């Protein structure tokens, strides 16, 4: 059994499963954050933030972190292996057309940009909320953080560019991961591309909308 995960296909499978897990997380994250926009009284968003401080969430955080670490490690392993193999693709796709897109050719670079964005996001929010609470300190007010962070159009633009990088990364990564886990019916190939592309676009457009709305709100435009 262990030999399976030492093989190229096994490594791709691990990276794909961890990637799908992270897609599920960002979907939930975006849906919860939308309450900031569509809750004029801020009661729902405050409830969401309170929920995020529960003990069960503190247990989930290490699992989520492990998902990121596993995905990054196997991305590095596969990228190095692919370069040594002179062009072997990162995912278990079954035809050359699957890796002809710009996103497919730049998955590793896009991944690095996404990683830098995660570091920025953790510094802006997680370090000032969950980490402070974990350290026994008083966490910052989430509304103050939203206003303080997105009041700067430059910071807002950086976040939007980060979301764009995630979009490019996932437009290829999502359906490629589905192929790797076995959903590789050629009849469905084009359909999966459309479905996954639409899904990723909806999620990342939601994130961008939240950031732009927060910027407009912080500057008194809404």
Walk through the language-model features, giving the residues of each.
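Membrane-embedded alpha-helical bundles that constitute the cytochrome b-like, heme-associated redox core
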Residues: 1-222
């Amino acid at each position: 059994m262990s030999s399976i995960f030492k093989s190229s296909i096994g490594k791709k499978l691990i990276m794909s499963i961890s990637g799908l897990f992270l897609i599920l997380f960002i979907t939930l994250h975006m849906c919860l954050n939308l309450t900031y926009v569509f809750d004029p009284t801020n009661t729902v968003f405050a409830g969401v933030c309170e929920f995020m401080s529960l003990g069960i969430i503190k247990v989930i955080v290490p699992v989520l972190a492990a998902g990121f670490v596993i995905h990054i490690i196997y991305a590095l392993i596969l990228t190095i292996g692919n370069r040594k193999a002179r062009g072997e693709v990162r995912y278990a796709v079954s035809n050359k057309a699957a890796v002809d897109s710009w996103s497919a050719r730049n998955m590793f670079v896009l991944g690095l940009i996404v990683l830098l964005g995660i570091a920025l996001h953790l510094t802006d929010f997680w370090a000032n909320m969950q980490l402070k609470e974990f350290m026994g300190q008083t966490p910052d007010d989430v509304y103050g953080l939203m206003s303080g962070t997105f009041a700067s159009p430059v910071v807002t633009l950086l976040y939007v560019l980060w979301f764009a990088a995630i979009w490019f990364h996932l437009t290829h990564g999502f359906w490629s991961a589905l192929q790797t886990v076995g959903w590789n019916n050629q009849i469905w190939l084009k359909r999966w591309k459309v479905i996954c592309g639409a899904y990723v676009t909806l999620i990342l457009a939601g994130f961008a909308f939240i950031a732009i709305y927060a910027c407009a709100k912080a500057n008194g435009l809404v």
